[in-house]
Amino acid sequence: MNLRFELQKLLNVCFLFASAYMFWQGLAIATNSASPIVVVLSGSMEPAFQRGDILFLWNRNTFNQVGDVVVYEVEGKQIPIVHRVLRQHNNHADKQFLLTKGDNNAGNDISLYANKKIYLNKSKEIVGTVKGYFPQLGYITIWISENKYAKFALLGMLGLSALLGGE
């Protein structure tokens, strides 16, 4: 076993993870969104978006219009919600407030908002506006998050390939 060769493999794995992290951060800066890519986790936006679709977000537009699909985060909940803008209000200070609703839901989202709010503050709660999507590719992440053994198996396979892989 050559120590120099093993250290080089470890360095390559570290470089791979650092490159992925830098790519994600660059994408976040370019889109002005902390989560520039999200996966649809429920059927609340059917038929427009199905469970497992990957959505690409953009957060550099000044105002959202009625009909735009936005992703927002509610205080106290970690899962972003993908819904359509039902109403929008602007005040004199260039702030925008949005009321949203899932296409497949009967009513609006007021019951989902934190602290009994009736509108979302775009600058504080909107993660981004959907600008594109890739159908069903997100099922991989859903499967990994819902299957506790899949996480360990995936990490194990990555570790084994890094250790056993040669040039």
Swiss-Prot record:
The active site is at residues 44, 83, 109. GO terms for biological process: protein targeting to ER; signal peptide processing. Its EC number is 3.4.21.89. Keywords: Endoplasmic reticulum, Glycoprotein, Hydrolase, Membrane, Protease, Signal-anchor, Transmembrane, Transmembrane helix. Residues 1-9 are cytoplasmic. Changing residue 103 to E: Nonviable. Loss of catalytic activity. Loss of protein stability. Disruption phenotype: Leads to accumulation of core-glycosylated glycoprotein precursors. Changing residue 109 to N: Nonviable. Loss of catalytic activity. Loss of protein stability. It is found in: Endoplasmic reticulum membrane. Residues 153-164 are annotated as: C-terminal short (CTS) helix. The chain crosses the membrane at residues 10-31. N-glycosylated. GO terms for cellular component: endoplasmic reticulum; endoplasmic reticulum membrane; signal peptidase complex. InterPro entries: LexA/Signal_pep-like_sf (IPR036286), Pept_S26A_signal_pept_1_CS (IPR019758), Pept_S26A_signal_pept_1_Ser-AS (IPR019756), Peptidase_S24_S26A/B/C (IPR015927), Peptidase_S26B (IPR001733). Residues 32-167 are lumenal. Component of the signal peptidase complex (SPC) composed of a catalytic subunit SEC11 and three accessory subunits SPC1, SPC2 and SPC3. The complex induces a local thinning of the ER membrane which is used to measure the length of the signal peptide (SP) h-region of protein substrates. This ensures the selectivity of the complex towards h-regions shorter than 18-20 amino acids. Interacts with SPC3. SPC associates with the translocon complex. NCBIfam families: sigpep_I_arch (TIGR02228). Belongs to the peptidase S26B family. Catalytic component of the signal peptidase complex (SPC) which catalyzes the cleavage of N-terminal signal sequences from nascent proteins as they are translocated into the lumen of the endoplasmic reticulum. Specifically cleaves N-terminal signal peptides that contain a hydrophobic alpha-helix (h-region) shorter than 18-20 amino acids. Present with 3150 molecules/cell in log phase SD medium. The C-terminal short (CTS) helix is essential for catalytic activity. It may be accommodated as a transmembrane helix in the thinned membrane environment of the complex, similarly to the signal peptide in the complex substrates. PANTHER family: SIGNAL PEPTIDASE COMPLEX CATALYTIC SUBUNIT SEC11 (PTHR10806:SF6). This is Signal peptidase complex catalytic subunit SEC11. It comes from Saccharomyces cerevisiae (strain ATCC 204508 / S288c) (Baker's yeast).
